[in-house]
Amino acid sequence: MDVIKQIEQEQMRYDLPQFEAGDTVNVHVRIIEGTKERLQAFKGVVIAKKSGTTNATFTVRKVSYGVGVERVFHAHSPSIDHIEVVSRGKVRRAKLYYLRKLRGKAARIKEKRF
C-alpha cells in the first residue's frame, strides 16, 4: 500500500486555491491542438466538489448563449494551468444540482460578505 500512496503523493497538486460549492471560479485549461498549445478559460459556478486524493473532482456550471454548460474537472490534472476564485457564494448546500432547473435571476447566488 505504501507504493500506491507514494505515487499518489507525487501526482498531487498543492498550488490549488481553496474554493467551495457556490463560488465563481475561472479555470484556465491547457488545450493542445496539433503542435500548438493555448489556454482556454472556463468561468462558472462550482456546483459540486468531490474530495479524494488524486481522483478529486469539481463540477463548474455556466450558461452560454442560453444553454447550460457543465464541465467536470479533475483537481490534480496537469491540463489545468491555474484556477482563479472570482467571488465567494453564500449557499447552504454542498451540492447545488437544483441550479439546473432554475432560469434567469432565480439561478443567481448571493455573494458572501466578510
UniProtKB/Swiss-Prot annotation:
Disulfide bonds: none annotated. One of its GO terms (biological process) is translation. It holds the Pfam family Ribosomal_L19. Keywords: Ribonucleoprotein, Ribosomal protein. GO terms for molecular function: structural constituent of ribosome. The keyword Ribosomal protein applies. One of its GO terms (cellular component) is cytosolic large ribosomal subunit. It comes from the Bacteria. PROSITE patterns: RIBOSOMAL_L19. The keyword Ribosomal protein applies. This protein is located at the 30S-50S ribosomal subunit interface and may play a role in the structure and function of the aminoacyl-tRNA binding site. PANTHER family: LARGE RIBOSOMAL SUBUNIT PROTEIN BL19M, RIBOSOMAL PROTEIN L19. Belongs to the bacterial ribosomal protein bL19 family. NCBIfam families: rplS_bact. This is Large ribosomal subunit protein bL19.
